[in-house]
Regions:
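Glycine-rich dinucleotide-binding loop and its adjacent helix/turn
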Residues: 32-55, 100-186
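Short internal beta-strands
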Residues: 192-199
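Glycine-/small-residue-rich beta->alpha transition segments that form the dinucleotide
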Residues: 14, 90-92, 96-103, 156
Length: 202
């Protein structure tokens, strides 16, 4: 990715609006929406400076276009910028180890790859977020309508005796399911919410 000149960039977003290449699935929204070839990775990114995805940018692929450079009044676009390693000194750091999302390809019984309306908890999180692909509105991905029935299936991939998952409890499913269920019941009181689980450890 080619980072723009962050000292010049004002974060106005015009480059993203005018970019003609808008068919790349958004990584942050888990592929539920598309982004442009020049984009801010997520709404709270620091610095709030867009980056250029070389693989999907028409300028890098064909040598033509350059729309983002033409519309940038601050002159912040730098197509010649190279990757570099920057060393900084800080008084403290936060180590966040993160996690890997379970691959649902091995769980055909849930029809995740067959039905647009079977989603993961992280995809639901993005849908329910006001800055997400549906602006916080709970919608079925198949038809855009609000669901009348919603089912959470807990413990998928946790406490598995086979090699598809992990033998231990993830320790987070219960908490975020309770959060999502309460948010949905509060915002959509006519929606029935059902939770299937092995054990509740909240």
């Amino acid at each position: 990715m080619c980072i723009r000149d962050r000292d010049k960039c004002t974060g106005c977003g015009v480059c993203q609006e005018k970019c003609p290449s808008k068919k790349t699935p958004s990584e942050f929204n888990r592929g539920l929406s598309n982004r442009s070839a020049i984009y801010t990775p997520f709404a709270q990114a620091i610095p709030n400076v867009p980056v250029i995805d070389r693989e999907h940018c028409i300028k890098f692929k064909t040598g033509k276009c350059g729309v983002c450079s033409k519309v940038c009044q601050a002159g912040a676009i730098d197509y010649d910028q190279k990757d570099e390693i920057v060393t900084e000194k800080y008084g403290a750091i936060v180590v966040a180890t993160g996690f890997d999302i379970i691959k649902l390809d091995n769980y055909d019984e849930y029809a995740y790859s067959q039905s647009k309306d079977v989603i993961t908890s992280l995809e639901l999180e993005r849908i329910m977020n006001a800055a997400g692909p549906t602006k916080g509105h709970l919608e079925r991905l198949s038809d855009g309508k609000a669901p009348k029935e919603l089912v959470f299936i807990q413990c998928v991939g946790s406490r598995c005796s086979d090699d598809r998952g992990k033998p231990y409890c993830s320790k987070i499913c219960c908490m975020y399911t309770a959060k999502h269920a309460m948010l949905i019941r509060d915002k959509y009181p006519d929606t029935n919410v059902t939770v299937f689980y092995i054990d509740v450890r909240t």
